Regions:
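S-adenosyl-L-methionine
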Residues: 2-6, 46-104, 110-168
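Myb-family helix-turn-helix DNA-binding modules
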Residues: 2-61
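Class I S-adenosyl-L-methionine
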Residues: 157-173, 178-300
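Short, surface-exposed basic-aromatic patches at helix termini and helix-loop junctions that form
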Residues: 39-42, 101-107, 123-128, 144, ...
């Protein structure tokens, strides 16, 4: 059955400063409650409220605040286990995970597409005792603390990774931490940076909960785009994402020998199984024979 284009059926209504302050005050204290917010703003559609919630959370660094401690604990756990010297934090945001990685690593390269996040990152850097060093017009902004260095790139993660590749900089670990999906970008980053470790946060669970069939069809490149992957429960989605990650890595290059095999080493739920996201740590190695890889994936 053909998909229908998603579109708004109502005229957009601008938010007053009073309503915005009311919503922000709620978000700073409570988790998202669709029923309550619809009662609080009866003249607004639920999609409109969700859109404003997302914008405010980004603007005020509230995304994932309820499970930020869980995420930081997992990051620190992985860092202590593998002790990476260099890390690429592809979606750094305000830098909460960046400064957990730098506690162990010597250098962290962080990228963030939203220019507004730089001030938040600078604030986090100052809180952690890092000083910003003037680098002029350089694409990378430098923060230092004793022998530790963080370089912050304002722009797309692929552009940042390409710059690291051109300058022949070694990366031990790549952190893909976003509220969306990083499945499409994964093969590119693997080929460019050739890390030994990958940590990935799966925001695709939001698409599953909101029944975004169109989004999941696009993201699950290992499946027939003409087939609806839904319905799926949490366990099925977890297995599907593991398979998607491993197949994306196996197909990253023309030759199997130049592609990658990812082994799931650890995982944690952020915010609970039925409301949050899954964060996973994979060890990266070279694939064995193509047939062995395909057999394992086919039987998983």
């Amino acid at each position: 059955m053909a998909l229908e284009r998603r579109k708004a059926n109502t005229i957009p209504v601008s938010w007053s400063q009073e309503d915005e302050k009311l919503l922000l005050s709620y978000l700073k204290k409570e988790s998202f409650d669709a029923k309550f917010l619809k009662e609080l703003f009866p003249n607004r559609t639920l999609p409109g409220i969700r859109s404003k919630v997302r914008k405010l959370r980004i603007k005020h660094d509230l995304f994932g605040e309820s499970y930020r401690g869980q995420k930081e604990d997992f990051t620190s756990k992985v860092a202590q286990k593998i002790k990476p010297k260099s890390v690429f934090d592809a979606y750094a945001g305000a830098g909460h995970q960046t400064f957990k990685w730098i506690a162990i690593a010597d250098i962290v390269y962080a990228s963030e597409k939203m220019k507004s996040k730089l001030k938040q990152f600078e604030k986090t850097a100052k809180t952690n005792g890092f000083t910003k060093v003037d680098t002029g017009d350089c694409l990378w902004k430098l923060f230092k603390k004793e022998n530790k260095q963080i370089l912050f790139f304002i722009g797309d993660a692929v552009d940042a990774a390409a710059d690291l590749k051109v300058n022949n900089l070694h990366i031990d670990l790549v952190d893909l931490d976003t509220c969306g999906s990083t499945l499409p970008i994964l093969p590119t980053l693997l080929v460019l940076l050739k890390p030994k470790h990958i940590v990935i946060t799966h925001g695709e669970f939001h698409s599953m909960r909101f029944k975004r069939e169109d989004v999941l069809r696009r993201l699950f490149m290992h499946r027939d785009i003409g087939e609806n992957p839904l319905p799926m429960n949490v366990d099925e989605m977890s297995k599907e994402l593991d398979k998607a990650v491993k197949i994306a890595a196996l197909r990253a290059h023309n030759e199997t020998s130049d592609s990658f095999w990812l082994s799931l080493e650890d995982e944690t739920w952020l915010g609970g199984r039925f409301h949050g996201m899954l964060r996973r740590y994979y060890k990266v190695s070279k694939p064995s024979a193509t047939s062995d890889c395909i057999n394992e994936l086919s039987n998983s």
